[in-house]
Amino acid sequence: MKKAEIKTEKGTMIAELYEEETPGTVENFVKLAKDGFYDGLRFHRVIPGFVAQGGCPYSKDPDDSRAGTGGPGYTIKCETDADKQYHERGVLSMAHAGRDTGGSQFFIVHDRQNTKHLDGQHTCFGKVIEGEE
């Protein structure tokens, strides 16, 4: 199983990726990471008890009002019919503005209680297994 290392100001998280269940999403995420796309980006949307969202290229500048609106310049298809499509604590899921419009933005789930409505709507493509505190 592939793993990803997500480095933040507060430490490093290790996530296992659901490459068998969501191959297109994992391939895209890994490619962006290897290409350095995510380097220096911030989690631009953090809502306690809900999610921490990152992956927007505009988030490098904390004063850029476009943070949360950017992407890689293309979109990918949702893979919400796969196994493991359950938004529980630690899950990595693709953010989007509508079905099949995601590209680079993703979020990490804080709490299952507030994310049940995301099941079947956003592709879950991994889960943090270390360092989520």
Feature names for model-found ranges:
Residues 1-133:
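Cyclophilin-like peptidyl-prolyl cis-trans isomerases
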